[in-house]
């Protein structure tokens, strides 16, 4: 899959693959509290296009931003970084 220009990429863990050609990933990030200066983990779920249905639950994947593919899908899977055990 070719990348057109610079697109945002994120890394996440697959939490659901029950839909056809669609997976749901959970991406975490660290956020610093403005007053207490403590880092906390925030997470968000994204629906991602998986053209070949090759992801399993627990896989770590890298996804890139793309054009809107449906009402909720704006991300496309680039590659699987680590397989689930």
Curated annotation (Swiss-Prot):
Top-rank taxon, per record: Bacteria
Gene Ontology CC annotations of this record: cytosolic small ribosomal subunit
Chain coiled-coil ranges: none
Transmembrane residue ranges: none
Keyword Acetylation in record: no
Biological process terms in GO annotation: translation
Pfam families: Ribosomal_S17
Keywords recorded for this protein, A-Z: Ribonucleoprotein, Ribosomal protein, RNA-binding, rRNA-binding
GO MF annotation: an example: structural constituent of ribosome
Keyword Kinase: no
Record's subunit section: Part of the 30S ribosomal subunit.
Primary role: One of the primary rRNA binding proteins, it binds specifically to the 5'-end of 16S ribosomal RNA.
Similarity comment: Belongs to the universal ribosomal protein uS17 family.
UniProt name for this protein: Small ribosomal subunit protein uS17
Native organism taxonomy: Bacteria, Pseudomonadati, Thermodesulfobacteriota, Syntrophia, Syntrophales
């Amino acid at each position: 899959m070719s990348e057109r220009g610079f697109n945002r990429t994120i890394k996440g863990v697959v939490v659901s693959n029950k839909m056809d050609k669609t997976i749901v990933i959970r991406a975490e990030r660290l956020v610093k509290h403005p007053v207490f200066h403590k880092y906390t983990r925030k997470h968000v779920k994204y629906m991602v296009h998986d053209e070949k249905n090759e992801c399993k639950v627990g896989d770590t994947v890298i996804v890139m931003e793309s054009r809107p593919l449906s009402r909720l899908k704006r991300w496309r899977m680039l590659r699987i970084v680590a397989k689930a055990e």
